[in-house]
Amino acid sequence: LAAIVSGQAEQEFDLGWNINTRGSWGLFEAIRSQGDSYCPRVVFTSSIAVFGSPFPDLIPDDFFTTPLTSYGAQKAISELLLADYSRKGMVDGISIRLPTICVRPGKPNLAASGFFSGIIREPLNGQEAILPVDTDVRHWHATPRSAAGFLIHAAELDTSKLNNRITLNMPGLSVTVQEQIEALGRVAGNDVVKLIKHQPDPVIKKIVSGWARNFSTKRSLDLGFKAETTFDEIIQIYIEDDLKK
């Protein structure tokens, strides 16, 4: 998983490259230095940030990567590095492009996508949440529970089934911010929804405007990866797994 997330990688250029890209390359080189007899499975957690607009309504695995953030570029480069080390037989690699993970537990981090979780997590904990974008913004989500499942399944998957195309879009759910808010109202009531305060942030809006919104995940679904199908379910999973723990 990324050590330097999207918003911070954009603000601290050198730090993002040193940790996210050089860190990945350093791991691959450390494995290679062990010799030909050592070829471990490496599951790389990539991101939908490798894609940038313009893009089709449904983005397939093989759509070209045009990241519009430093974080996305760092992830795309690491995907290519892993593919080459895998091609050379130095590692047995698979890259999984995670949706934005929602609802993230704990305190907010510096990810530009953090508000997608914040507008659910904070109100459910009785706290005010700031919404920095318009409610018609559409995005791609999956829960921490699904992300853990993706990683375990990727670690166990027979990679010969990938036919050397080792990068996969993970399943997820495409919803607007408005649909998130409506789901929160159904699950927790309108008093909770009233804790969301709209406060536009032009920096966040610019970053989010270049992000992908929906994906074709037939390959990953056919390979047995699974995710949620409604945002109500995403909220319920947060309540079950993380609320006030």
What are these regions (language model features)?
Residues 107-112, 135-149, 164-184, 237:
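Substrate-binding strand-loop-helix patch
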Residues 25-69:
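Conserved Rossmann-fold NAD(P)-dependent oxidoreductase catalytic core, especially the SDR/UDP-sugar
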Residues 53-55, 68-94:
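Active-site Tyr-X1-5-Lys
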Residues 23-26, 63, 69, 73-78, ...:
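Conserved cofactor-binding/catalytic machinery of classical short-chain dehydrogenase/reductase
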Residues 198-200, 210-222, 229-245:
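Amphipathic terminal alpha-helices
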Residues 1-19:
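NAD(P)H-binding glycine-rich loop region in Rossmannoid oxidoreductase-like domains
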Residues 150, 154-208:
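Mid/C-terminal beta-alpha module of Rossmann-like enzyme folds, strongest
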Residues 83-138, 144-149:
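NAD(P)-dependent short-chain dehydrogenase/reductase
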